[in-house]
Amino acid sequence: MKASLFSPLKMMHGAALGTAVSVAVSMLVASVAVAPADAVAAPAKSTKSAKAAASAKGKKRTVAAEKKAAHVAAAEAPHRSRRHVTLAAGPGRHHGAVRRVAFQPRQQSVGQAFGLHDTSDALALRSSVAYVVDQATSEPLFDKNSHAVVPIASISKLMTAMVVLDSKAPLEEQIEVTDEDRDYEKGTGSRLSVGSVLSREDMLHIALMASENRAAAALSRYYPGGRPAFIAAMNAKAKSLGMTDTHFENSTGLTSLNVSSARDLVKMIDAAYQYPLIRRFSTDRTYTVFTGKRSLVYNSTNALVRNPSWDIGLQKTGFINEAGECLVMQTTIHGKPIVMVLLDSFGKYSRTADASRVRNWLDAGGGERLTAANTGAGGT
């Protein structure tokens, strides 16, 4: 079974997933060819014939230049899809320089590297890991690579929220974002600038709803005992929930070392669902905060919460290259509480499309235990 390739953490250190994206920059400066003036005019020719001769020569040069340009364009055509071209012209300059930057394809996710995407399933999901459970009975309804241990990105923030609320720290306490809360591993940005001050409650709100990374980082730093104590509490909470495939290295999920399995995540979702604030904050559509400098309007990272046809009780999205597109949800379908875990999906909208495929399947009468193994795949 492919899942046997994975074990918490050991798999993570062996995979060649830290491939740096190399960027090759070259400067292309256009040169302008100027025809030399004739030193001596032919006296036997009239002015009119001289002009005609010059015109003919000019046409020959133009045709030759066009042929050369076409040849160069044809040679460069296969590489154009790999280059981003920017024209840079500074103030007072008379020429511009064309900068061509070659990009390598996005690095593989862990699931791609270990062949999890080779597992087919009856619903043709883009997610390499999928697990759907009847929340009331804990009965698995759909299973695809549910034992595989993979990075979970910002799904980690559900555990972050539980640890924050378990600490009983005052929700009204003001928390300031500092340089320590920047993302130095992935280099991601944030609208929450250094020096911003929000209440613990607001930080938790935007961390869950909008996956605001600096908010999650600041929450861990303000924990009693600091960030190391917070991470220890996350792992202790996971252990107490019986999450044996799970390990956390930070509160944001911006590391490939935050790993879990779909089966473990069902346990985490069930636990998080018991917190009313987590349910409310994670399913809000929009929320405005005042940072002490300005007001910021945040929107949910999950478009499905804005879709009235969905009844979502809890949700969280996640993405880093190593994890792919991730989505976990508690939702009600035909009066039945359902937990969905979709990990390592490829494509910007693929995770929500997969959720819709699962719901349509359940709407059509699906619901008996269906695994990738009994639909012709190589096992889960």
Feature-to-residue mapping (PLM):
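Domain-terminus/edge residues, biased toward the C-terminal soluble/receptor-binding domains
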Residues: 243-247, 253-380
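Hydrophobic alpha-helical segments and their boundary regions
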Residues: 11, 15, 19-20, 123, ...
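N-terminal secretory targeting signals
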Residues: 2-126, 364-380
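Secondary-structure junction/capping motif
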Residues: 62, 187, 199, 226, ...
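Active-site-adjacent loops and short helices of periplasmic peptidoglycan-processing enzymes
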Residues: 89-94, 98-263, 267-276, 333
